Amino acid sequence: MDRVKRVIHCDRAYKMGLNGKNITVAVMDTGIAPHLDFDQRILHFEDFCQKKLAAYDDNGHGTHVAGIIGGSGLMSKDKRGVQLLSGVAPRVRFVVLKVL
């Protein structure tokens, strides 16, 4: 992720205060697993496959995609407390539609 963020110049956006705050992204994929890196930013989950009510991901792909987009990096801290990884827009909110 760090390499990708360098290639697409995320540092420029971050310096301008652009980090996903007040932005909502729809992820249409295999779902999303509740995770501390999404720290209550999943606004809505809709399951079009099995009609379950609670957020889940029975494949992992949707959670991976959501992490790339907006994982906070909270769970990637090293022993010193230094955050190692985060998504491109770590403050974004999610609407997740399980379609696969």
List the model feature ranges, each with a label.
Residues 14-25, 32-44, 52-100:
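Subtilisin-like serine protease catalytic core
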